[in-house]
Amino acid sequence: MKKILSIFLLCQNVFADNLGDAITAWKNLVSTVKGITYSAINSSLPIKDVEQWKALMNEAINNQADTLSVTIVNFDQNVYDITTFRSYDVAISAKGSVTGTIANITYSFSYHSNYRMTRAYETGSKDKLNVEELAVYDKLVTKAQEIKSQYTSDFDKEKAIHDYIVTTFKYGPLDVETPPLRAHTIVGLINDGEGVCEAYAQTFNILGKMCGLDVQCITGKMEGVSHMWNIIKLDGEYYHVDVTSDDPTPDDGNRLIYSNFNLTDEQISEKHTWDTSQFPKCTATKYNYYDYYGLVATNYSELQNIINSALSKGQKTITFETRNYILNSSNDIKSLFQGKGFSSIYITGDFGEVGAFSITVS
């Protein structure tokens, strides 16, 4: 007896509020993308065990095949389960027929734009990119070359990428309840100038790789909401970096803070949660921005020294972080500038709690 088999699996791990609409949007988007080279894989040998099947499926996904046709002996739908490959990177559908215990199945794959972009770098082939993705990819290559020509240390390259993203783009769109799928993509962030956390993290990820950095994306939650950020390896030790959280809302392209730049597990876990078994442990503090530059104030005297040192160098923007020391109001800072000849002082930061502050004077 022949049975018709039809299964569809859509990845469900897109990072924003109201994810259902974003997933539906992706489903519609991948069916209309133009300008991509399509490929099909046909396995001439029958599959006799699940490990052989998994290897073939992984090969198809890694090569971004559009279809994979197979014959499976002793087929059991519960064993040959495509949910095994659940990922935000790929949507998989399966159609075919089962006669007795032999199944003839064609799997179809649709790939997230971010996956195609990252794989283009990893494989060195841009054949799978559509026209818009190709233009953005080349723009990122140019940016990475610019950064590498200016900086030699991994820390400086990382900071340059962080600062580029924070000062160039903004979080959004903020005028819709559910951000469109495009707002989750590298392409959307670069070409539209705005995006959500996934776009920020994936852009940091691919630029980091292009600059030779050991960087990866990490998924979890921030204050209970699905979120994506990054982990970077510097001098053999790992750090968290959340570029999205360092970009102020509403956007201020002139403001740079580093509250989430190279944090330990303990530091970032104040607001973030994740499956710690799936990612490297982050315990180092050397390359935390404020530690690295000596911009940590634990009392009034240390804050005074930080400000005076910056002013002596002619700096008009001063950043620092308080630890075990609370600034209750802007007056706590303004008093340090009295008699120094400035007509305006612009301060950003959360008074009444420890954290990062930025001061601009003129």
What positions do the PLM features span?
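Solvent-exposed loop/turn segments at secondary-structure junctions
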Residues: 167-172, 176, 195-197, 221-225, ...
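Sec-dependent N-terminal signal peptides of Gram-positive bacterial secreted proteins and lipoproteins
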Residues: 1-17
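Secondary-structure boundary elements
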Residues: 130-189
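A short, highly charged nucleic-acid-interacting micro-segment common to nuclease
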Residues: 186-200
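Linear, non-domain "peripheral" regions
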Residues: 17-142, 312-314, 328-331, 337, ...
